[in-house]
Amino acid sequence: MNLKGKKIAITGGTGCIGGLLVEFVAQKGATPVIISRSPAPNSKWQYIHGDLSNIDDVTAIGKQLAKIQPDILVNLAGIQYFGSLDEQPSSQIEMLYQINLIAPVLLTQAVLPSMKKRGSGQIVNIGSIFGSIPFAHFVTYSSAKAGLKAFSEALRRELTDTGINVTYIAPRAVKTPINNEKVMQLAKQTKMAMDDPERIVARIANAIENDAKDVYIGFPESIFVRVNALLPRVVDGALAKNDRIAAKILTPQS
């Protein structure tokens, strides 16, 4: 889809990747609509304030989006948890699924009627390689992103012949504040490749412009996605060392 003249709603539009994406699409001639719980630094763009972890806020944001009728919705906002499932607070589990999966579904639902009436539109869901290669100690994050991947695939099939495209983009690790000190320690000890936010933003914009279906960013991670789908036990073995390193990082030092 040509970005010029298009209204693009972006959740997490004031974050590290979101802020860069807002500026990138604006330079392409699009009109960004920023959705964030943080104040928007640039007042010249339309701004919707709301916390995606709050279901009432999500409902209110959805109503505003229904009125704005964006051409493109980018579900970018997300949170991460690195740790053992048995130690993750239930409130944090609920919040993670709410932000990473439920909010994208509800906001998509809110914009679909206007897109169907117009006969065009695009839903862009930003997932993760972890959604296709679930990692130990990222259980809720991996499963939420796997859910977003399945949502994208099912919705794409449902919207056949409507003129609405659904794009799923799965980056590998990215250098952003979402990664806490322990995640960065894991990345260093396992030699995990991490991309700069600018590269991810360029790939997102390119995927939108080319109406891409599924985009997996990074090599060899994109190959492992296919291997894991066919031979998951092979990937189990390949990740065993990393899993042990993660467990050691998470073990309190006496």
Where are these regions (language model features)?
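Active-site helix of classical SDR
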Residues: 108, 144
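C-terminal helical subdomain
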Residues: 168, 188-225
